[in-house]
Amino acid sequence: MKIGILALQGAVREHCRIVHKLGHKTVDILYPRDLIGIDGLILPGGESTTISKLLVRYGLLTPIVELGHKKLPIFGTCSGLILLSKNIAKSEQYRLGLMDTYVKRNAFGRQLASFETKMPIPILGNIPYPTIFIRAPYIDKADKGVNILLSHESRILFAEQDNFLAASFHPELTEDVRVHEYFIQKILSYQKFCNL
């Protein structure tokens, strides 16, 4: 399996490390040609406005949207969650707009307000998951087609819709591989669907 990792900014190496640990290959996505032959795509955290402009500059925005409509599994963390959303509060930035969600940016404040805590995520099993939030966004509202995997104080922090997965936290900064394993299961389901 080959998983593309958007390499314009953010924790690219950290995502690569976990995907490799799980026994799969990665490819850095910098240009549209890099998208050829990938089985899934990860959008790492970073600064969402900058990343959105770079997606346009490097000609990646439209090809990624097209792949999303073709059901390619896409996983966004932190700013990746923002990019996947159709609606971003107080922002006109470019976005992929693939998930029926309404997002608030920098919801947990500045760098100093960032934090780490263990939270139960039932879909990942009984052991609480170490969530790391860095100037994290959250999903304020979600349409019916969105499955909420984790919420806290009415803020949606982890969700999926069809082939898309979005987390407001940074699973790539932990040693716990369960979120990435869950995404890989999405890819395997997609591959089975394609082979029907």
Swiss-Prot record:
Query: Which residues make up the binding site for L-glutamine?
Result: 46-48, 105, 134-135
Source organism = Azobacteroides pseudotrichonymphae genomovar. CFP2
Catalysed reaction equations from the record: aldehydo-D-ribose 5-phosphate + D-glyceraldehyde 3-phosphate + L-glutamine = pyridoxal 5'-phosphate + L-glutamate + phosphate + 3 H2O + H(+); L-glutamine + H2O = L-glutamate + NH4(+)
Pfam families from the UniProt entry = SNO
InterPro entries named in the record: Class_I_gatase-like, PdxT/SNO, PdxT/SNO_CS
Q: Which PROSITE patterns match?
A: PDXT_SNO_1, PDXT_SNO_2
- What cellular-component terms does GO give this entry? cytosol; glutaminase complex
Q: In which pathway does it act?
A: Cofactor biosynthesis; pyridoxal 5'-phosphate biosynthesis
Q: Name one GO biological process term.
A: glutamine catabolic process
Q: Protein name, please?
A: Pyridoxal 5'-phosphate synthase subunit PdxT
Gene3D superfamilies attached to this UniProt entry: 3.40.50.880
Q: How does it assemble?
A: In the presence of PdxS, forms a dodecamer of heterodimers. Only shows activity in the heterodimer.
Citing just one GO molecular function, the answer is: pyridoxal 5'-phosphate synthase (glutamine hydrolysing) activity
Q: Where is the active site?
A: 78, 170, 172
